[in-house]
Amino acid sequence: MQTDNTKSNTNKTAKQEWGSFAFVICIALLIRILIMEPFTVPTGSMKATILENDYIFSTKYSYGYSNYSLSFFDFIPLFKGRIFAREPERGDIVVFRPPNDMNVRYIKRLIGLPGDKIQLIDDVIYINDKKIERTEVGTYISEEGIKYLKFKETLPNGRTYFSYKLAPIFGVIYNDRYGNTDVFYVPEGKYFFLGDNRDQSNDSRVNLGFVPFENFIAKAQFIWLSTKITWWDNDIGVINLVLKLKPWIESVRLNRIFRNLYSTDE
């Protein structure tokens, strides 16, 4: 009889533990789906605001919810448009699905709102025929030793941020077609994005085009971790992952941890 009671108590405890574990998993999934989601940035299109292998904390609720912003369900057409929608602001850094490749995620700065007229002339942004404030404030040398000119830009709503342009080499300007564009008329329900790394960004000036509001996933807020190298790789196997762990930890950029993406402090 004592043995049966012991088994019963053990089974009850195991069920309680599994129930608690399942509850925690459900809460974590709900947080990721509805509140926040971490992203890793693989490219330098937002350099030096965001570097390769920056780990970004983003808020899912900032713009409401669409089929594309609901993690794990974005492949199911649950509904169209957005629910609990909040209007994005000029200068926001947004994670979104590019309309020409729904299998990836981009992160760019929102420059043009629906109805805007956008053009770049000599690298200066013109919004509705008015140029934004743009001042050269210094230079930036990347980890690869590449020199960039650093500019402080101010949008019409007062949002300020830094943009970067490859420094001329022997007087030659790199990729000048990015700095002098056609006129873009932003359609209703769509937005115009630029990368802060102006010469090395696939954005609304080139292949990306305009981005529908429905494609917005989250608003990027701050960097919670940053490393010089990537650790996880599905192709290298468990042993190599273990061997790579130490150099990955040693590559952490301590000065970037918990950096606010909207701060213009030097």
UniProtKB/Swiss-Prot annotation:
> Which keywords appear in this protein's UniProt record, sorted alphabetically?
Cell inner membrane, Cell membrane, Hydrolase, Membrane, Transmembrane, Transmembrane helix
Q: How does it sit in the membrane?
A: Single-pass type II membrane protein
Which Pfam families does its entry note? Peptidase_S26
According to UniProt, the reaction catalysed is: Cleavage of hydrophobic, N-terminal signal or leader sequences from secreted and periplasmic proteins
Which ranges does the record list as Cytoplasmic topological domains?
1-20
Periplasmic side residue ranges read 42-266
GO BP annotations of the record are: signal peptide processing
So what EC number does this one have?
3.4.21.89
Protein family: Belongs to the peptidase S26 family.
What name does this protein carry? Signal peptidase I
Q: Which organism is it from?
A: Rickettsia felis (strain ATCC VR-1525 / URRWXCal2) (Rickettsia azadi)
